[in-house]
């Protein structure tokens, strides 16, 4: 287990697609569980595109200061790091169909970590 954790930590630093794949799988699984539903199908089917296409899509929405090196970083300051954010929060889902639609790639955006964690949270802004 220690080896696996160290391996994944190192791979996250060197292979951004590996990092995206892990984070998106966890993000989608957790959002479905929070609404008391079960994940049915593969992550890419729910997402609506491959992980490579998702990476390209997110990069097309980057602000000038965003890159994969500052993804997930947070120190309480604006424009320090960014998170993957659901544009329409999954907490607003009222049904299984809605939660699946809200996990489509087109409902994701890169958002400043400060804005996402302090201002937006589970709100639509």
Per-region residue spans from a language model:
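Short Cys/His-rich local motifs and their 1-3 flanking residues in nucleic-acid-associated proteins
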Residues: 117
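Contiguous alpha-helical segments
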Residues: 1-83
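Intrinsic structural disorder
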Residues: 58, 124-125
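Histidine-centered nuclease catalytic patch
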Residues: 66-110, 121-123
């Amino acid at each position: 287990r220690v080896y696996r954790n160290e391996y994944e930590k190192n791979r996250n630093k060197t292979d951004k697609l590996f990092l995206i794949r892990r984070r998106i799988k966890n993000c989608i699984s957790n959002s479905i569980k929070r609404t008391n539903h079960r994940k049915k199908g593969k992550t890419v089917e729910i997402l609506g595109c491959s992980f490579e296409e998702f990476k390209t899509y997110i990069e097309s929405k980057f602000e000038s200061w965003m890159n994969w090196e500052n993804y997930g970083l947070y120190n309480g300051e604006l424009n320090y790091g960014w998170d993957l954010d659901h544009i329409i929060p999954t907490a607003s889902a009222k049904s299984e169909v809605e939660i699946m639609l809200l996990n489509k790639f087109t409902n994701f955006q890169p958002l400043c970590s400060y804005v996402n964690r302090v201002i937006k949270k589970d709100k639509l802004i």
